[in-house]
From Swiss-Prot:
It comes from Thermotoga neapolitana (strain ATCC 49049 / DSM 4359 / NBRC 107923 / NS-E). This is Large ribosomal subunit protein uL6. The gene is rplF. Pfam families: Ribosomal_L6. GO terms for cellular component: cytosolic large ribosomal subunit. It comes from the Bacteria.
Amino acid sequence: MSRLAKKPINIPQGVTVEVNDGTVKVRGPKGELTQDFLPYVKIEIEDGKVWIRPNEAQVRRKSDWRKVKMFQGTYWSLIRNMVIGVTEGYKKELEIVGIGYRAQLQGNTLVMNLGYAHPVVYEIPSDVKVEVPAPNRIVVSGIDKQRVGQVAAEIRAFRPPNVYTGKGIRYVGEVVRQKEGKKA
């Protein structure tokens, strides 16, 4: 368990957190997120704070404490990410590097020319927003941290950065270590 899980999660103004039967629902100005949890921990709301405490009923022997503490830290992070998501949201930026490589939005699909003989078409999920501010830049945003990261990773997987030339799709700020080519 991380030491962070011993601290409560503050609930900001305009955010409501509901806990019932292993399900946590977080509502905020940007939307609503729901997550199911296993009964290894007790999730309680006291004085505008969310506490994640070990469920002692799940501990049958001493070795079970390890699993309970593990879930306590994990669930603390998941609930905190939900609260941040419904208040601020999450964003991942990708850049396309390469001559003739570009992206454009056509309705609910992202069409990318990535050096293949055909354009790559990606259907955008409904819970994530994708913008193309420039032909070589893609911005993925949403309230669910996991979904935003998953969609960004799927887009990047169409043409990951080449280790010799550096061409491909990369995260903004990602450093691609380039290998040296063959010596003649």
